[in-house]
Amino acid sequence: NKITTSHIQQLKLFTREHYLGQLNIEFEEEPSEKALKINEEAAKLVAFPLQNALEYQQALLCSEQDTLTGIKNRNAMDSALEKACDASKRYNTDLSILMIDIDHFKKVNDTYGHLTGDKILQRLTAVLKQSCRLADEAFRFGGEEFLMLLQNTAQDGALEMAERIRKSIEINDFGGVLEEKDLPLTVSIGVAQRDLNDDIQQLIEKADQSLYFAKRHGRNQSIVYSEEIKNDSPSS
Protein backbone atom coordinates (compact mmCIF):
# COMPACT_ATOMS: atom_id res chain seq x y z
CA ASN A 1 0.00 0.00 0.00
CA LYS A 2 1.38 3.40 -0.94
CA ILE A 3 0.58 7.05 -1.56
CA THR A 4 1.47 8.61 -4.90
CA THR A 5 2.11 12.31 -5.50
CA SER A 6 -1.48 12.76 -6.76
CA HIS A 7 -2.86 11.69 -3.34
CA ILE A 8 -4.22 8.31 -4.40
CA GLN A 9 -4.09 5.51 -1.86
CA GLN A 10 -3.69 2.13 -3.54
CA LEU A 11 -4.95 -0.79 -1.49
CA LYS A 12 -4.45 -4.35 -2.66
CA LEU A 13 -7.33 -6.67 -1.78
CA PHE A 14 -6.30 -10.11 -0.53
CA THR A 15 -8.25 -12.89 1.14
CA ARG A 16 -7.77 -16.63 1.53
CA GLU A 17 -4.38 -16.17 -0.11
CA HIS A 18 -6.03 -14.88 -3.29
CA TYR A 19 -5.36 -11.50 -4.85
CA LEU A 20 -8.74 -10.00 -5.76
CA GLY A 21 -7.74 -6.66 -7.20
CA GLN A 22 -6.86 -3.13 -6.20
CA LEU A 23 -8.92 -0.39 -4.56
CA ASN A 24 -7.86 3.18 -5.40
CA ILE A 25 -8.96 6.01 -3.10
CA GLU A 26 -8.36 9.56 -4.29
CA PHE A 27 -7.96 12.48 -1.87
CA GLU A 28 -8.39 16.18 -2.62
CA GLU A 29 -5.47 16.90 -0.27
CA GLU A 30 -2.77 14.85 1.39
CA PRO A 31 -4.45 12.41 3.81
CA SER A 32 -3.51 11.95 7.44
CA GLU A 33 -1.96 8.75 8.76
CA LYS A 34 -5.20 8.07 10.63
CA ALA A 35 -7.23 8.26 7.41
CA LEU A 36 -4.82 5.88 5.69
CA LYS A 37 -5.07 3.36 8.52
CA ILE A 38 -8.88 3.52 8.50
CA ASN A 39 -8.91 2.85 4.78
CA GLU A 40 -6.52 -0.09 5.18
CA GLU A 41 -8.84 -1.68 7.73
CA ALA A 42 -11.86 -0.96 5.54
CA ALA A 43 -10.15 -2.68 2.61
CA LYS A 44 -9.72 -5.82 4.71
CA LEU A 45 -13.44 -5.78 5.50
CA VAL A 46 -14.34 -5.28 1.83
CA ALA A 47 -12.20 -8.20 0.65
CA PHE A 48 -14.21 -11.01 2.27
CA PRO A 49 -17.69 -10.09 0.99
CA LEU A 50 -16.13 -9.42 -2.41
CA GLN A 51 -14.62 -12.92 -2.39
CA ASN A 52 -18.02 -14.37 -1.43
CA ALA A 53 -19.74 -12.44 -4.22
CA LEU A 54 -17.21 -13.68 -6.77
CA GLU A 55 -17.64 -17.28 -5.60
CA TYR A 56 -21.43 -16.96 -5.80
CA GLN A 57 -21.17 -15.50 -9.29
CA GLN A 58 -18.91 -18.37 -10.36
CA ALA A 59 -21.30 -20.96 -8.90
CA LEU A 60 -24.22 -19.32 -10.69
CA LEU A 61 -22.28 -19.35 -13.96
CA CYS A 62 -21.47 -23.05 -13.56
CA SER A 63 -25.12 -23.89 -12.86
CA GLU A 64 -26.18 -22.16 -16.09
CA GLN A 65 -23.35 -23.26 -18.37
CA ASP A 66 -23.11 -26.47 -20.38
CA THR A 67 -19.75 -27.97 -19.47
CA LEU A 68 -19.11 -29.59 -22.87
CA THR A 69 -19.95 -26.74 -25.24
CA GLY A 70 -19.47 -23.71 -23.00
CA ILE A 71 -22.81 -22.14 -23.97
CA LYS A 72 -25.78 -21.73 -21.65
CA ASN A 73 -27.70 -24.82 -20.61
CA ARG A 74 -31.38 -25.70 -20.17
CA ASN A 75 -31.60 -23.98 -16.76
CA ALA A 76 -30.42 -20.68 -18.21
CA MET A 77 -32.62 -21.18 -21.27
CA ASP A 78 -35.82 -21.47 -19.25
CA SER A 79 -35.12 -18.20 -17.45
CA ALA A 80 -34.08 -16.35 -20.63
CA LEU A 81 -37.16 -17.53 -22.54
CA GLU A 82 -39.50 -16.42 -19.76
CA LYS A 83 -37.95 -12.95 -19.72
CA ALA A 84 -38.02 -12.69 -23.52
CA CYS A 85 -41.66 -13.81 -23.66
CA ASP A 86 -42.67 -11.29 -21.00
CA ALA A 87 -40.89 -8.51 -22.90
CA SER A 88 -42.53 -9.58 -26.16
CA LYS A 89 -45.98 -9.41 -24.54
CA ARG A 90 -45.36 -6.12 -22.75
CA TYR A 91 -43.87 -4.23 -25.68
CA ASN A 92 -45.64 -6.10 -28.49
CA THR A 93 -42.36 -7.10 -30.14
CA ASP A 94 -41.56 -10.10 -32.32
CA LEU A 95 -40.00 -13.18 -30.77
CA SER A 96 -38.83 -16.31 -32.59
CA ILE A 97 -36.86 -19.42 -31.73
CA LEU A 98 -34.94 -22.03 -33.69
CA MET A 99 -34.79 -25.67 -32.63
CA ILE A 100 -31.68 -27.26 -34.15
CA ASP A 101 -30.90 -30.99 -34.27
CA ILE A 102 -27.92 -32.81 -35.82
CA ASP A 103 -29.06 -35.30 -38.45
CA HIS A 104 -28.07 -38.94 -37.87
CA PHE A 105 -26.03 -38.03 -34.80
CA LYS A 106 -26.42 -41.54 -33.38
CA LYS A 107 -24.66 -42.82 -36.49
CA VAL A 108 -21.82 -40.35 -35.85
CA ASN A 109 -21.40 -41.71 -32.31
CA ASP A 110 -21.71 -45.34 -33.41
CA THR A 111 -19.23 -44.90 -36.28
CA TYR A 112 -16.62 -42.60 -34.74
CA GLY A 113 -17.21 -42.89 -30.99
CA HIS A 114 -18.55 -40.52 -28.37
CA LEU A 115 -15.35 -38.47 -28.08
CA THR A 116 -15.65 -37.54 -31.75
CA GLY A 117 -19.33 -36.86 -31.17
CA ASP A 118 -18.38 -34.44 -28.39
CA LYS A 119 -15.97 -32.64 -30.73
CA ILE A 120 -18.74 -32.30 -33.30
CA LEU A 121 -21.01 -30.73 -30.69
CA GLN A 122 -18.26 -28.26 -29.78
CA ARG A 123 -17.61 -27.32 -33.42
CA LEU A 124 -21.32 -26.92 -34.10
CA THR A 125 -21.56 -24.65 -31.07
CA ALA A 126 -18.82 -22.47 -32.55
CA VAL A 127 -20.85 -22.11 -35.76
CA LEU A 128 -23.91 -21.08 -33.73
CA LYS A 129 -21.94 -18.49 -31.77
CA GLN A 130 -20.50 -17.04 -34.97
CA SER A 131 -24.02 -16.75 -36.40
CA CYS A 132 -25.44 -14.97 -33.35
CA ARG A 133 -26.21 -11.29 -33.54
CA LEU A 134 -25.73 -9.18 -30.43
CA ALA A 135 -29.20 -9.83 -28.97
CA ASP A 136 -29.38 -13.52 -29.97
CA GLU A 137 -28.68 -16.33 -27.51
CA ALA A 138 -27.77 -19.97 -28.12
CA PHE A 139 -28.52 -22.76 -25.65
CA ARG A 140 -27.88 -26.48 -25.48
CA PHE A 141 -31.39 -27.91 -25.20
CA GLY A 142 -30.14 -31.44 -24.54
CA GLY A 143 -28.18 -34.16 -26.34
CA GLU A 144 -27.60 -33.02 -29.92
CA GLU A 145 -30.39 -30.43 -29.81
CA PHE A 146 -29.80 -26.69 -29.55
CA LEU A 147 -32.15 -23.74 -29.25
CA MET A 148 -31.57 -20.20 -30.46
CA LEU A 149 -33.53 -17.30 -29.02
CA LEU A 150 -34.11 -14.47 -31.50
CA GLN A 151 -35.62 -11.37 -29.93
CA ASN A 152 -37.17 -8.64 -32.08
CA THR A 153 -37.16 -11.11 -34.96
CA ALA A 154 -40.18 -12.12 -37.03
CA GLN A 155 -40.68 -15.37 -38.93
CA ASP A 156 -38.91 -14.30 -42.14
CA GLY A 157 -35.83 -13.10 -40.29
CA ALA A 158 -35.77 -16.27 -38.19
CA LEU A 159 -35.94 -18.44 -41.31
CA GLU A 160 -33.10 -16.45 -42.87
CA MET A 161 -31.00 -17.02 -39.75
CA ALA A 162 -31.87 -20.73 -39.74
CA GLU A 163 -30.80 -21.15 -43.35
CA ARG A 164 -27.55 -19.31 -42.73
CA ILE A 165 -26.76 -21.70 -39.87
CA ARG A 166 -27.82 -24.79 -41.83
CA LYS A 167 -25.70 -23.91 -44.85
CA SER A 168 -22.69 -23.03 -42.68
CA ILE A 169 -22.82 -26.45 -41.06
CA GLU A 170 -23.41 -28.25 -44.36
CA ILE A 171 -20.23 -26.84 -45.93
CA ASN A 172 -18.11 -27.00 -42.76
CA ASP A 173 -15.44 -29.71 -42.81
CA PHE A 174 -15.33 -29.54 -38.99
CA GLY A 175 -11.57 -29.10 -39.01
CA GLY A 176 -10.76 -32.73 -39.78
CA VAL A 177 -12.70 -34.07 -36.79
CA LEU A 178 -14.12 -36.76 -39.06
CA GLU A 179 -11.51 -39.00 -40.65
CA GLU A 180 -13.75 -39.82 -43.61
CA LYS A 181 -16.21 -37.73 -45.60
CA ASP A 182 -18.76 -40.51 -46.22
CA LEU A 183 -20.76 -39.25 -43.27
CA PRO A 184 -21.77 -35.67 -44.12
CA LEU A 185 -22.89 -33.52 -41.22
CA THR A 186 -26.15 -31.65 -41.60
CA VAL A 187 -28.81 -30.23 -39.30
CA SER A 188 -32.56 -29.93 -39.38
CA ILE A 189 -34.08 -26.75 -37.97
CA GLY A 190 -37.56 -25.94 -36.72
CA VAL A 191 -38.57 -22.27 -36.82
CA ALA A 192 -41.40 -20.75 -34.79
CA GLN A 193 -42.56 -17.20 -34.09
CA ARG A 194 -44.55 -16.40 -30.95
CA ASP A 195 -48.20 -15.69 -31.66
CA LEU A 196 -50.09 -13.16 -29.57
CA ASN A 197 -51.32 -15.62 -26.94
CA ASP A 198 -48.45 -18.11 -26.97
CA ASP A 199 -46.61 -18.87 -23.77
CA ILE A 200 -43.07 -20.26 -23.81
CA GLN A 201 -44.13 -23.89 -23.73
CA GLN A 202 -46.41 -23.41 -26.73
CA LEU A 203 -43.63 -21.66 -28.64
CA ILE A 204 -41.18 -24.49 -27.92
CA GLU A 205 -43.76 -27.08 -28.99
CA LYS A 206 -44.25 -25.28 -32.31
CA ALA A 207 -40.51 -25.18 -33.00
CA ASP A 208 -40.23 -28.82 -31.96
CA GLN A 209 -43.05 -29.89 -34.30
CA SER A 210 -41.40 -27.95 -37.14
CA LEU A 211 -38.08 -29.64 -36.41
CA TYR A 212 -39.51 -33.14 -36.54
CA PHE A 213 -41.49 -32.32 -39.66
CA ALA A 214 -38.14 -31.39 -41.24
CA LYS A 215 -36.59 -34.66 -40.08
CA ARG A 216 -39.52 -36.79 -41.27
CA HIS A 217 -39.49 -35.13 -44.68
CA GLY A 218 -35.87 -35.41 -45.74
CA ARG A 219 -33.69 -33.66 -43.10
CA ASN A 220 -31.09 -30.95 -43.83
CA GLN A 221 -33.73 -28.23 -44.11
CA SER A 222 -35.31 -25.39 -42.16
CA ILE A 223 -39.08 -25.53 -41.69
CA VAL A 224 -41.36 -22.77 -40.38
CA TYR A 225 -44.32 -23.75 -38.21
CA SER A 226 -47.69 -23.79 -39.98
CA GLU A 227 -51.12 -25.41 -39.76
CA GLU A 228 -49.88 -28.11 -42.15
CA ILE A 229 -47.20 -29.03 -39.63
CA LYS A 230 -49.72 -29.01 -36.78
CA ASN A 231 -51.94 -31.43 -38.70
CA ASP A 232 -48.96 -33.60 -39.68
CA SER A 233 -47.79 -33.98 -36.08
CA PRO A 234 -48.14 -37.53 -34.68
CA SER A 235 -49.84 -36.09 -31.58
CA SER A 236 -52.53 -34.29 -33.61
Predicted feature locations:
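A short, aliphatic-rich beta-strand micro-motif
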Residues: 6-15
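Short regulatory alpha-helical coupling segments
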Residues: 61, 74-94, 125-133, 151
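Amphipathic alpha-helical "output/dimerization" segments
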Residues: 31-51
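Short catalytic/binding micro-motifs of nucleotide second-messenger systems
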Residues: 87, 130-135, 167-180, 211-213
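Alpha-helical scaffold within the catalytic cores of cyclic-nucleotide enzymes
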Residues: 125-126, 157-175, 208
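Conserved nucleotide-binding and Mg2+-coordinating catalytic segments in signaling enzymes
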Residues: 60-79, 100-114, 122
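A short pre-motif secondary-structure segment
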Residues: 137-140
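Catalytic-core segments of nucleotide cyclases and related cyclic-nucleotide turnover enzymes
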Residues: 159, 193-236
